[in-house]
Curated annotation (Swiss-Prot):
It catalyses: Endonucleolytic cleavage to 5'-phosphomonoester. Manganese or magnesium. Binds 1 divalent metal ion per monomer in the absence of substrate. May bind a second metal ion after substrate binding. A divalent metal cation binds at D22, E23, D120. The lineage of its organism: Bacteria, Bacillati, Bacillota, Clostridia, Peptostreptococcales. It is found in: Cytoplasm. Its main location: cytoplasm. Residues 16-204 form the RNase H type-2 domain. The keyword Manganese applies. It comes from the Bacteria. GO terms for molecular function: manganese ion binding; RNA binding; RNA-DNA hybrid ribonuclease activity. Endonuclease that specifically degrades the RNA of RNA-DNA hybrids. It comes from Alkaliphilus metalliredigens (strain QYMF). PANTHER family: RIBONUCLEASE H2 SUBUNIT A (PTHR10954), RIBONUCLEASE HII (PTHR10954:SF18). This is Ribonuclease HII.
Length: 204
């Protein structure tokens, strides 16, 4: 599969700066949802970049450094569990994506606006040409790169959250609803970073 096929078509149409955008943590019971947007140089193909869920943590970390080194610009958007409970997870994910696009920054600290955005199966409320690509992290290198950046940054946050809330095993399951996590919730109750709207069936 040519992971630049979609990007190549857009470059041929005259779009120069093409961003990939993806989110991580949508299905978690705990913590923020996080999105990343990445703009890579025209024509650059990075070996091994694919959907972050198909990579080992070690390989994700390695590729994160390669992406960071080569990216024209990167941006991250984070939406808290509290806001997720207020506006629902889909809207929170879209807001995180929008924030990640608006926070795109070059290595020199300058803001960057892309000509076009490729988004993993979602539309962003922003006045920039875009396409929602189903299974985008498999079909577009830009979206796959964004998925890796988002996953690495959120996993690092999970390690920090685990130190603050040691009863739940967050570093191990990253906030997802594993048996260990559900049992800890029943034993200790939810922390302030748990998504109350996700816990109704567990804590009924």
């Amino acid at each position: 599969m040519n992971r630049l096929e979609i990007e190549n078509q857009l470059w041929e149409e005259g779009y120069e700066s093409i961003a990939g955008c993806d989110e991580v943590g949508r299905g978690c019971l705990f913590g923020s949802v996080l999105a990343a947007t990445v703009i890579l140089p025209k024509g650059l193909l990075i070996e091994g970049v694919k959907d972050s869920k198909k990579l080992s943590p070690k390989r994700r970390e390695e590729l994160y450094e390669v992406i960071k080194k080569n990216a024209i610009a990167m941006g991250v958007g984070i939406i808290s569990a509290e806001v997720i409970d207020q506006i629902n997870i889909r809207q929170a994910s879209r807001l995180a994506m929008k924030k990640s696009v608006l926070s795109l920054t070059t290595i020199d600290g300058e803001s960057k606006i892309p000509d076009y955005i490729l988004v993993d199966a979602e539309n962003i409320d922003i006045a920039i040409p875009q396409s929602a690509i189903i299974k985008g992290d498999d079909r577009s290198q830009g979206i796959a790169a964004a998925s890796i950046v988002a996953k690495v940054i959120r996993d690092r946050l999970c390690i920090r959250w685990d130190e603050e809330y040691p009863n739940y095993g967050i570093a191990q399951h990253k906030g997802y609803g594993t048996k260990l996590h559900r049992e800890a919730l029943l034993k200790y109750g939810p922390s302030e970073l748990h998504r109350r709207s996700f816990l109704k069936k567990i804590l009924k």
